[in-house]
Amino acid sequence: MSKIEDFGRPEILTLDSYVPGKPIEEVEREFGITGVIKLASNENPLGPSPAVIESLKEAAPSVFNYPDSNCFKLKKEIAPLFGLSADHFVFGNGADELIKMIGETFLNPNDEIIYGWPTFSEYIFVSKLMGAKPCA
């Protein structure tokens, strides 16, 4: 009988599982302290700005619509600011998606990827996923 590992890319087996940072409450309990500010997960200790809250309120009635994944309106607005056409821009759902997209497009097996340490884990992840060799 075949195992699922026999059907996937062999590089998948080299990937480490993501280990998220501990929640603030757990760190406070573990060390017996209060007032911890967590920066590792890009959490803002001040919360969202009032302008963001207002924007979310304004957008709330249309959240049932699937967003334009091509970001047509955004591209049209920012292209003139840079003197470029809209097709020069690519947007993604955060750095993870963009780094992965670049890696999937340009990395080949055995390419060497040089990165600084410590670094964002996605560089190592996509390098291994594509069979490239991450080098710190």
Per-region residue spans from a language model:
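N-terminal "arm"/small-domain region of PLP-dependent enzymes with the aminotransferase-like
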Residues: 2-65
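Conserved beta-strand segments of alpha/beta enzyme cores
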Residues: 11, 35, 88, 133-135
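Short glycine-rich anion-binding loops that position phosphate/pyrophosphate groups of nucleotides
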Residues: 42-45, 95-96, 120
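Phosphate-binding glycine-rich loop
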Residues: 64, 69-112, 130
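PLP-dependent aminotransferase-like
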Residues: 105-136
